[in-house]
């Protein structure tokens, strides 16, 4: 991802948080993580994150999704003696379509990113609007997509070890690489 794309996404996220009435410090805004997952199409498959805290006991983040932007299917595996990350998503603004293992929906409301259909395999649908939340157990495949306006989701979880996430799509690179062009 180019540095200009990262800056534009970060500025867009700042505006989303402002609209949602969620205050972030200038330092937090500078540290917004913009992940395109190495797929080169941030608007379609990507995620923006602000990590408040991540210790060996717990983690708190804000996840920002642009309209119809999808975080690719993945799971959080056991690491060492830890069973894997358990996370609760609480929608703060907009709408998020969350898909987990379980009985598939007859018709899903999200759109699987074109060309990536083979890498989206779970379709039990949970729709979250502001104030609603859902807890994802460790080791559960899941993916999620912002609604028509996008979404802001607070994540409360056990320790986050993103570098160990297992994505269904083998092309995904979890840790972002930014090429600054200035």
Swiss-Prot record:
Mn(2+) binds at residues 74, 76, 87, 142. One of its GO terms (molecular function) is D-lyxose ketol-isomerase activity. InterPro entries: D-lyxose_isomer, RmlC-like_jellyroll, RmlC_Cupin_sf. Keywords: Carbohydrate metabolism, Isomerase, Manganese, Metal-binding. The keyword Isomerase applies. Optimum temperature is 70 degrees Celsius. It catalyses: D-lyxose = D-xylulose. Its cofactor is Mn(2+). Transmembrane segments: none annotated. Optimum pH is 6.5. One of its GO terms (biological process) is carbohydrate metabolic process. Belongs to the D-lyxose ketol-isomerase family. Sugar isomerase that catalyzes the reversible isomerization of D-lyxose to D-xylulose. Shows weak activity with D-mannose and L-ribose. Homodimer. This is D-lyxose ketol-isomerase. It comes from Cohnella laeviribosi.
